[in-house]
């Protein structure tokens, strides 16, 4: 409940020109706390309210409300909730020190705090909230959690809006992939609408002829090399076809039409025919061997035959015929 009330108090502004006129027409150090006591930010159960009521009915305590120094000095002797001035622009302007980098402002800073007495030690003070008095307007300073939460909410809201807008932008094409902006085709026809507005008023300088030729040397050389390679590949393929076009890798080549191929037996037939051929048949293209001359045995009277000489086949046949005649 208290946090909800503090959250609502951070959003309001309070001012009362009538009370300013009743207090002399302007705010100063001795009436700033009493002007603050008229605002909704003030707590009636604080020590400030108790001391003011006691001073109204007790003459011995009246001097405590005449000056702010006396009033805050009396509050320091009490414990509980209190409101004190943390920054006085009039006192800052009256100081002779030149420690201020800028001119003193007219902003008053008032703190709401609790004081607890400790025996033999200084009082324990806990600041609950801070208020600003600008002119006759009173504001409540937001807490750190409120400031950080507001900034986070603003950032998240902006990111949510961005994601909603960006979710409809990406598109996918096989040529470019995922892109947020589809590639726009470049206009090539000068007769299209808007082409005249894109043209430059001044003549575009043309590149030199030498530089243009130098740029074309590379592509022309690459094209010539590709054409030469294609021609060489075609010639090699044609040569392989002419040399090995009639050969088969299978022993039994396939014959027939697609869908009804059969294995032929021409390979087996050719091997059988080759094995039956005589070995002395000269192959085409081979050199024929020389035919041996038959030897003729001549018997010379009075001369013994040479050792190691063997009768020929014709001599053996003649001897056999003679023996057969003698036997008859």
Swiss-Prot record:
Gene name in the database record: med6
UniProt name for this protein: Mediator of RNA polymerase II transcription subunit 6
Family: Belongs to the Mediator complex subunit 6 family.
Keyword Nucleus annotated: yes
Predominant subcellular localization, coarse grouping: nucleus
Bias (Basic residues): 319-328
Organism the protein comes from: Aspergillus oryzae (strain ATCC 42149 / RIB 40)
Polar residues bias locations: 188-203
Subcellular location: Nucleus
UniProt-annotated stretches for the region Disordered: 173-212, 251-328
KW Magnesium (keyword) present: no
């Amino acid at each position: 409940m208290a946090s909800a009330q503090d959250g609502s108090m951070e959003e309001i502004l309070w001012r009362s020109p009538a009370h300013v006129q009743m207090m002399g027409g302007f705010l100063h150090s001795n009436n700033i706390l009493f002007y603050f006591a008229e605002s909704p930010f003030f707590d009636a159960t604080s020590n400030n309210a108790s001391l003011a009521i006691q001073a109204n009915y007790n003459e011995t305590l009246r001097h405590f409300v005449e000056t702010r120094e006396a009033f805050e000095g009396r509050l320091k002797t009490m414990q509980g909730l209190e409101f004190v001035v943390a920054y006085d622009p009039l006192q800052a302007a009256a100081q002779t020190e030149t420690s201020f980098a800028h001119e003193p402002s007219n902003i008053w800073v008032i703190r709401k705090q609790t004081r607890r007495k400790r025996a033999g030690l200084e009082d324990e003070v806990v600041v609950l909230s801070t208020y600003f008095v600008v002119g006759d307007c009173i504001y409540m300073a937001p807490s750190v959690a409120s400031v950080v939460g507001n900034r986070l909410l603003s950032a998240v809201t902006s990111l949510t809006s961005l994601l909603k807008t960006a979710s409809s932008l990406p598109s996918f094409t096989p040529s470019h992939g995922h892109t947020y902006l589809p590639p726009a085709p470049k206009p090539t026809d000068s007769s299209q609408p808007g082409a005249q507005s894109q043209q430059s008023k001044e003549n575009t300088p043309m590149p030199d002829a030498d530089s243009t030729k130098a740029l074309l040397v590379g592509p022309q050389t690459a094209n010539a090399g590709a054409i030469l390679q294609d021609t060489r590949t075609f010639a090699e393929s044609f040569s392989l076809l002419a040399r090995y076009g009639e050969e088969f890798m299978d022993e039994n080549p396939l014959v027939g039409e697609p869908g009804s191929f059969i294995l032929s037996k021409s390979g087996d037939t050719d091997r059988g025919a080759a094995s039956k051929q005589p070995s002395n048949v000269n192959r085409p293209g081979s050199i024929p061997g020389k035919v041996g001359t038959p030897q003729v045995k001549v018997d010379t009277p009075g001369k013994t035959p040479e050792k190691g000489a063997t009768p020929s086949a014709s001599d053996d046949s003649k001897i056999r015929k003679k023996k057969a005649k003698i036997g008859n």
